[in-house]
Amino acid sequence: MSNKPDANDQCMVKETISRMSMSKEKPFLRRNYSSPSFNDSVNSVNDEFQTYQLPNGEFSDNMNDLYFPFRKGNESLMTENSNYPISEQDTQHNHISDFPSRRMQLDGMNHSNNDTYSTAIPFSKDSSVFDAVGQQSSVPIHINPAYTNSHQNSYSLNETYLSYDFFDNHRGASSSAVSKDGLASPRPTKDVDADDTTWYFTSSPSFQPLKDSDRSQTKNTHEETSPIVSSPEDDADAAFKPSSLPSTSISASSNAFYKPAAPDNERPLDPHITPYLRLQLLTTGADDNDIRKNALTQVDYLSYDWKETDIWASWREITKTKANYDNGIRLENASWRTWMKHKFKLKTISPETLNWLKECDVTWLYGPLLHTSMPSRHHSHRKKEKEKEKSKAPRVTPLTHKTNDDEANHSETSSGSSLAKKPILKRRTPQELLLSGRDLTPWPQIRRFDSLLARNRGDIFSNRNHATIRSALFSQRYPSHSKRHIHFNDRVQQCIAVDIDSLPSDSESASYNTDDANSVVSPSKDGISTTTVSSDATRSSQSSHFRIIEDLPDSKLKYSLEDQATYDQSSRYPGRHFGKTGRSHFPRAPEYYGENDFEEDEVYRDDRHYENEHDEYDPNLIYYDNEPTEENRLVFEDTNNTFIDTDSDDSNADESQFLEYANDSPNSSESLESLNNQSYSSSPYSVFSHPPPYMGRQSLNDSPQTSDFKASNLNDSSSNVHSIFQTRETTSPSVQNKTPTKYHRELKSSKDGHEQASPLVSSSPSGSFTSQISPAATTTATNLDAVSLSPSTVRTGSQISDIGNDAISTTRKTVRAFLENANPYSTNNDGNPSNNTSDVEVNETSMNDNSEEPISSNWLVDLFQKSLKSFRE
């Protein structure tokens, strides 16, 4: 086969140009050209020519659209590059709407005779198609397949007498007239208004030689490209596929048909070519709506076990592409039903229960299953490229603090590089914290002054290894996003740092520090090995004393003080911090020191009570920050006077539950104290470890231990009865106001047996309040105001019963005497109060020892009976 073009192709171009020149009075407008053969296309040219008249009345030879047919011979000369769209500005003119499809379809494959080949040549109204045509003129067709503004290639046919110039979108381009001999002579052109000028922003075709081996590659390339927007008139044919193959220049000559043109930077620029049209081919990116997920499988929408995220992903895909599925609407509805079932946890009724299984029924509905984690088609290749780049990229090592001695010590640090790379996995023990001390500066300030600390301690961290260790140490103790996770244990390990003047022998110290991974033993000048932590080597070497760690017995959280284990007597270094009993004066309250919550002032404080090593441990004492005083004793007060105006039953509230907290000091002072008028609503027994100064205390001078309550101790006279109930009436306002009474009744045995009522004398708060009272004492209003309980108040069952019987008998006599002498409810016949004992008869049998029925005739008798009943139980 010959590489020269067919003769019919050359004649076609000549004949077309000659017919153009003959129709000077009637400028032509080429609309479309579809030719099954060359002769038919030439004969039909006259039918397609139309006259176009400018707005100023002159006829112009300009063309709005020109299509040149190219007949292909036996070999493929040209291949399709692009179908370029027409700009939006073309649609603003009415005369453009009638134009046919502006496209260029040139394919390297063989076509039938009915194929259409056309190209759109854009230009303006005031520009000429013909300009200075010569015999050796070329046909420059400037294209840019790489989507740039430069004109790269030039294609010429040497036997044509036509030159195509594409003008920029500016007015004033040269126009010319076409003569009969086929030559064009330039002529002046008037400026046309912008409204009368039409600019066609379309691109010219790109031609390149195509080999037989490249046809399949070109075809595959066309199928893989993405469509972009096209002209409104050409909805069906506007999609173009830019080729990825490089374009070349073609020139026809007598010897060789293909001749590459010179590059743009080597060719001299013609002044007539400078206003060439700069085409900007905009490549639009893929829209988010075009992103599709790859459905890997098909599942039954009616019986599949769905996840909520998969339901949303599948439903979104179905709503966009339901037209592509036969059951798209059913799949969409099934997605909604599945989502409602999953959200509200509904149950599914089997078809068998509804007799739904028939021959024509289909109980399945298959559709695409998509997951939210599936990669999309649009980004799948990009993710693969990023993964490859990450795998190929070298790993960047973190920068560490460099000093001036790094290069000098490079040879020395190379041997210990393996040790520096080893991560610090062991957490710092309490022993290390005690020896090295805690960084009292908060972590933000440490980061702020890290550079200053590094300069001041340059001798310690003099190389890269030390800096790495230090950074790793701080990063472990103080993470960037610190969220403390505290795990509590039943037992807490305790230890204490002890300062000693001299260390033991080398063998003992070496065996003592075998389990300390971070401790080092270094010989000193005196031959004594010093045991220190590596991070604290400088500080320990400067100090003259030495520190050792002593283990304390494990403390159990929330445990009583008596249950703590005693320290082993065979301790290696008991020191001055341990008492005779082996118990240390370390705070006995169980405390947990976390890694970041450790404070040295909590380990040993001078103001605590462990200065004297000969003090014995007293389990009945509670130690405070200061010396234990009488103010720190426990006080139990009856602030509400519960036994005066309420019906209380404290059978279950035995005083023995308070005995372990009571004070059993036998030699305490028994001074009298008074209460203020302050009101406190609390339980009958209020416990105060530090009573407020305004709350006084009360006590009884005579304890039931030293005085016996007998019936003979009380007199049946009316004066005695009146004195008792006068006190009762006096204290009644305080009872109603729920305030502690001011007065205290002392039961004293006198020669005549009369009870004397004396007010309490106020005393200082520092006085003792360890006086004791028995719950079996006489039930008066003031006896139970405030008491202090201790183990000495424990009574046996026989003693309590005897005291109770004596109190009952005494109460009966008191009530009888009161009813005989001062009964406010008894009156005589005249209506005046009567003191006659015959007016009120008291049944003696109702008040015997075995009777427990209260006397209902008087409220005072009921009160006494209920109080006695509660004490008796």
Swiss-Prot record:
Subcellular compartments: Cytoplasm; Vacuole membrane
Compositionally skewed regions (Basic and acidic residues) per UniProt: 211-225, 743-755
GO MF term set: protein phosphatase regulator activity
Low complexity compositional bias, start-end: 665-686, 758-773
Signal peptide positions (record): none
Domain of life assignment: Eukaryota
Gene Ontology biological process terms in this record: cellular response to glucose starvation; protein catabolic process in the vacuole; regulation of carbohydrate metabolic process; signaling
Biased composition range(s): Basic residues: 376-385, 574-586
InterPro entries reported in the protein's UniProt record: AreA_GATA, Glucose_repression_reg
Keyword Cytoplasm assigned: yes
One Pfam family from the record: GATA_AreA
Region Disordered: start-end pairs: 1-24, 175-251, 375-423, 506-540, 568-592, 662-773, 822-855
Ranges of biased composition (kind: Polar residues): 698-740, 823-855
GO cellular component assignments: cytoplasm; cytosol; fungal-type vacuole membrane; protein phosphatase type 1 complex
Keywords: Cytoplasm, Membrane, Vacuole
Positions of transmembrane segments: none
Protein name: Uncharacterized protein C227.15
Organism phylogeny: Eukaryota, Fungi, Dikarya, Ascomycota, Taphrinomycotina
